[in-house]
Amino acid sequence: MGKVYDWFEERLEIQAIADDISSKYVPPHVNIFYCLGGITFTCFLLQVASGFAMTFYYRPTVAEAFASVQYIMTDVNFGWLIRSVHRWSASMMVLTMILHVFRVYLTGGFKKPRELTWVTGVILAVLTVSFGVTGYSLPWDQVGYWAVKIVTGVPDAIPVIGSPLVELLRGSVSVGQSTLTRFYSLHTFILPLLTAVFMLMHFLMIRKQGISGPL
């Protein structure tokens, strides 16, 4: 085992990386509220794991979506638990994200030189809410259907570009299969990819600049 470690150490300098991670200075004023960002990230990982598990059984069609969700809940081994974890961690992610934003704002963590860290955080907050909007419609029950109909109809009030925006969101004039397909693609591919990219940027900036000092 030692020879294997030495082989990797010689090429990747693993010990230097480990020392850098473990020796990062943590200011004495840091308390439990500074963990909210990490809790949000943990919830995101739970979302990815449980969501990936459900893609094996979920069918993104208006005719089969609701039945496939019912199948997950009643017939798939531990399916009810996987979906419940997905829902609970989604709610927890939104809650901890909001608390994290408030904590950063109230402690002045958005000030120079951390403006870009704040910007990436705000973008992540928007992406988190977008997860909720797109995921809410996927069971394609009455609640999900009318929710997506209302949400996609909001831009219609914008002059000139309102109607084209509604059609872009829905995939057609009315809510239907095209809408569900778009929301499924957003929820399972586009939003997770964007979130991963901005989280990486967010973490690298925090790593570079460190935790902000007290007010």
Curated annotation (Swiss-Prot):
Presence of the UniProt keyword Kinase in the record: no
Localization, UniProt: Plastid, Chloroplast thylakoid membrane
GO molecular function, one term: metal ion binding
Chain positions recorded as heme b 2 binding sites: H86, H187
Keyword Transferase applies: no
BP-aspect Gene Ontology terms: photosynthesis; respiratory electron transport chain
Protein name from the UniProt record: Cytochrome b6
Native organism: Coleochaete orbicularis (Charophycean green alga)
Gene (UniProt): petB
